[in-house]
């Protein structure tokens, strides 16, 4: 029996946008089988027990052109904010290598909730929703285990427990309700969640540190067609995209999107604008912005 939807974001199931099943949680966090592209992002700033400052970013990207070809990738980056250095790692699961006999997809993504793994060349990667002692999902609470290798050959690993402090926000606030045009594709969905609390362990080469952070950022998009399909005319180079998250000292976070038409002198295109997230106010949206 399906549980009734709740207006309390701290409980599942939760309807972020009334009347739109695409933004019903926990399903919105998981894989969308009817979409050719599905993307998961998590990023944040971390402080080590030693006082050192780090940041990280990871991307899981599921691509199924024509719903038959596997063209996925996983990216993990660590940033040493004190020294101004960074390491990035990306593992691809692309044709023709993954079309060889016996090849299996590297990425597994569950439907109905977030439970995702990727078998990278640097090791096994996981991002999944935590469960309580009764095996019930704990809303927006994740175990994240990321691995990679930096350009110098040093191993990178980040193990985090991530917990929420505020509700997810539909991109564009009440004006768009999370349903936008992206890279020329209408009916693209996106939400984000900021103020995520993170605790865990960072390992990078010979460095091993216990880390914490309170400015974690989860971001999601899912596209009816492959994300770089080029929209109606099929030109995959027609659009460019800038995306920023800014965390202000007053507790307001900004998700800023700007899209441009490369074929028309980089004219600004929809969806573009800034959406706010804060702990004590409804999200707001503005499209008249300068960056």
Task: Tell me the role of every PLM-derived stretch.
Residues 2-291:
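Structured soluble/peripheral alpha/beta segments that form catalytic or ligand/cofactor-binding pockets
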